[in-house]
Each structure stands twice: as structure tokens, then as C-alpha cells.
Regions:
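A generic structural signal for well-ordered alpha-helical segments
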Residues: 2-4, 146
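Contiguous beta-strand/loop segments that form the cofactor/metal-binding neighborhood of enzyme cores
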Residues: 78, 82-169
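Short beta->alpha connector loops at strand-helix junctions that form conserved
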Residues: 1, 15, 135
């Protein structure tokens, strides 16, 4: 952001994932109180596109893990921020405190390619966030589960036209 300001250019993130109709429906269900008090949100954004250590020789990939070009974060800044925004958007709460475990699973990388983050939201909700670029078998896996005192919701970006709603002591309904 500071570099962009000094350069006179705009630095912005397009949080397009919250534009999906069923993500907006999740937000309205939470705001309406359908889930009651939100107890926990589990969100992940994982993929395995950077699992190959040989990518260190690929200039199209190398910059992502170079602090001089990417800044202070790798995978979290690339994908994890979308997961955090999703949790904030759906819950209507903002991050208040967090504890993060960032790790480079490939020794040649200076920035993280995997992260676990525990977040306390300003409304009291806890968020468990995992983001990884070395999760072989995951394909652009943005998923969110919201657990409240009256029920739970589950949405996956791989199946964006389906939202699972499970009320306490009820059957799961697939909303399409």
C-alpha cells in the first residue's frame, strides 16, 4: 500500500467471491438471525498449484515468495485474505485479534505457502482459517462453514449454486 501511494497508483483487492448469490444469501440468513448467535466460522482457501519446489526457477511463480516483490506475506496475502474477508462479510463482524502460524513448506521460499490463523471477531465469533498453496488435490478450494446456536451453513466455491442449511435437530436442506 505504501509503495502504491509513493508511486501514485491504486492498490486494491477485488473481493469478488462475496458476489455469489448464495454467499449473499448466507449473509442475509446470519443477519436475520436464522442461525442464532454465531459460535464458529471455519473457512479455507487451499490449492496445490505451488506444491512443486521446482517452481523456484519459474519467474511467473518466483515473485510470489520474494519479499522484495510480494511484500511481507505470500499465501495469506494471495488467498487467505479472501477467506478472511468471506468470514467478515458473512458474519457482519470484523477481525479484532488474530494468532497466525505461517510456514514455508519448501525451504527455498522466504514467504509462507501455508498458514493457519485463529481470529477473534469484534462480535465475539471465533474464526478458524486455513490457506495453503501446497495442498495437492485441492483445486481453488474456497469453502466456508458457519455454525450458530440454531443451525449451520456450508458453501463451497467449487459448487457455488448450492448452499447447505442444517437447522439444529433438523435435516440438511440444499438451497439452490
Amino acid at each position: 500500500v505504501a509503495t502504491a501511494a509513493r508511486s501514485g497508483v491504486v492498490c486494491a483487492v477485488n473481493y469478488g467471491y462475496t458476489g455469489y448469490p448464495l454467499v449473499r444469501h448466507m449473509r442475509s440468513m446470519v443477519a436475520r438471525g436464522d442461525l442464532g448467535k454465531i459460535r464458529l466460522i471455519v473457512v479455507e482457501f487451499s490449492h496445490g498449484f505451488h506444491a512443486n519446489a521446482a517452481d523456484a526457477d519459474n519467474p511467473r511463480m518466483r515473485w510470489r515468495y520474494d519479499p522484495a516483490q510480494a511484500g511481507i506475506s505470500g499465501q495469506f496475502a494471495d488467498c487467505g485474505i479472501h477467506a478472511l474477508h468471506m468470514a467478515s462479510y458473512v458474519s457482519g463482524q470484523n477481525a479484532k485479534e488474530l494468532a497466525a502460524d505461517f510456514v514455508s513448506t519448501i525451504a527455498s521460499r522466504s514467504l509462507e505457502d501455508d498458514a493457519m490463523v485463529n481470529v477473534r471477531m469484534d462480535g465475539g465469533t471465533r474464526v478458524r482459517l486455513w490457506t495453503s498453496s501446497v495442498a495437492v488435490g485441492s483445486f481453488h478450494g474456497l469453502n466456508i462453514r458457519v455454525f450458530g446456536e440454531k443451525g449451520g451453513l456450508r458453501w463451497a466455491q467449487q459448487w457455488p449454486d448450492q448452499l447447505n442449511w442444517t437447522p439444529v435437530n433438523g435435516r440438511t436442506e440444499v438451497i439452490e
